[in-house]
Amino acid sequence: MKNELKKARTQKHKKIIASIPYTLLFAYMAIFVLGCETSQTSSGNLDTTNITPTQSQALQIIQNALVDEDSLARVNAVEVIVTTGQIKFMPQVQRLLRDKFTPVRFAAALAIGDLRYSPAKSSLSQSLKDEDINVIVAAAYAMGRLGSTKYFEIVRKAIDNDDQTVRANAAFILGRMEDRNSLKLLKWAQEDKDSSDKVRLQALEARARLGDDEVLPRLWAIVYSAYADDRIMGIRAIGALATSKARDILITKLDDDILEVRLAAAEQLGKLGNRTGEMEVLEAVEKNLTTGLDREASERANVLAALAIGEICTPELTKFLPNLLKNESKFVRIAAAKAVLQCKMK
C-alpha cells in the first residue's frame, strides 16, 4: 500500500517538469524560473578580487551556461545574471539579442530592461524589428525602462493579441512595469473568454506582483489544486503578493505531500524573509530525499532545493551548495550557482 501511494504521488506530480521549464512564458522558462525576480544590482556585482573558491566556481558555471549549446541553459544563465545583478556579464547578454532561439533573445531583452543596461540601447532598436513579436514586446519593455517610455504602449497593446503566448508574455511584463494602471488590462486578460489558462494564470501572478489583494481567493484555490504543478505555480504567485495572508498560506504548504511543493513554498517564504521552511529544505538535502526518484524528478527537486537555499541562506543550508555545484545536471549546477551568488548578496 505504501509503495502504491508513493507511485500515485509520483504520477500526480509528474507533469511538473513539463509545466515549469517549458511553461507560460517564451522566456525565463527554466526549471527554476517562472519569471525572474527583481535584481539587487547595487550589491550583486561581486568583486572578483575578493571572492571565495565557491563563488568563483559559481561565476564560472554562469559563464559557461551563457554559451551552452542548450538554449534553456542560456536562458537560465540570463535569469541568474538579472537576479544577482551581475552587470559584468551584460555585454555577453547583449550579444544574445542575436541568438537564433527566440526564448534566448526574449530573455536577453528583458534582462537589459530589468538592469537598465543603457549600452545596449542601440541593439534594442534592432530588436524592435525582430521577426518574433514576443521579442519585440520584450524589447519595447527594455526601451521603456531605459527612458523611452512611449514603447510601453507596445506592451499594453500586446495583451490583446490573438496569440496566447504573446498575450501571456505581455501579462508577465505588465506585472514587471510597476504600474498599477495596468491592473485593468490584466483583469481583462484574466476574464476574457478567449484567454487560455496560461494567460489567466500569468495575469493573476502579474496582478499579485502589483499588489492586487483581490487575486488572493483565486490563488488560494490554485495553491490547493489536486495537481502538484498547479500548486507550485500558485505558490509562486502567492509569493509575489507578499502579504501576511500570503505568508500564512505558504506556511501551510510546507506540509504538502509532494516534496517539490514543499520546497517551492520554502523558497517563496525565504523571499519574504521567513525561514520557516528551512527544516523542509534541510531534510531534503540532508536525508537525500531525491533517492529513488527518476532522473527527471531528482533534477527537479534538486533545483528547487538549491533555489530555496538561495533565499534562506542559513549556514546549515549553504554548506550543501558546494556539492550541488558539482551535480551531474547543468540545471542543478546553475540553480546552485544562483544560490551562491544570492547568499553573497545578503
Residue positions per predicted region:
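Short inter-helical turns and helix N-cap capping residues of alpha-solenoid HEAT/ARM repeat scaffolds
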Residues: E69-D70, K100-F101, E131-D132, D162-D163, ...
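Bacterial lipoprotein signal-peptidase II cleavage site
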Residues: E37-G44
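C-terminal motif of bacterial Sec signal peptides marking the signal peptidase cleavage site
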Residues: V33-G35
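Bacterial N-terminal signal peptides that target proteins for export
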Residues: E4-L24
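Amphipathic alpha-helical scaffolding segments comprising HEAT/armadillo-like alpha-solenoid repeats
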Residues: T38, T52-A65, Q86-R98, Y117-K129, ...
